[in-house]
Amino acid sequence: MNPTDPQHEPLRVGPTKILPAGVIQFQEYLSGETGIEVIIDARTRESYVATVALVPYGAPHPGAGGVWLKGWSENEGVPQALELAGVVRLTGRKHRSGWVIADHGELTERALQVRDHQLHQRKR
């Protein structure tokens, strides 16, 4: 493995209205959907789940490389910050879940590479 490969470089995001800037860490739900966590302090590994690639009640599967993003409450502006950082491309699709609406995004090619690398490293 070459440490200069793009998947070895962290993806950064933020700040948003409420959250400070941080580094993206990908997770995977048991159902296979992608989760996104923002690590705020890399030294202490303090994390804040700034955007959980939600599985909103009744929502269709987000698709391969797709995510449902929480952009309300403390996560206001997070989907837009993820797009600005080159992590996702917002598709304009939305899904109402109760009183809130989740935004649909698709991971960029670079984000897919980083996600696959991070998940592979954890499974070793």
Predicted segments, located by residue:
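Short intrinsically disordered terminal tails
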Residues: 1-2, 120-124
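Protease-labile, long low-complexity intrinsically disordered regions enriched in Pro/Ser/Thr
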Residues: 9-29, 58-65, 70-77, 99-101, ...
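Acidic, aromatic-enriched beta-alpha/helix-loop junctions
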Residues: 41-86
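Short, compact, well-ordered microdomains
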Residues: 72-122
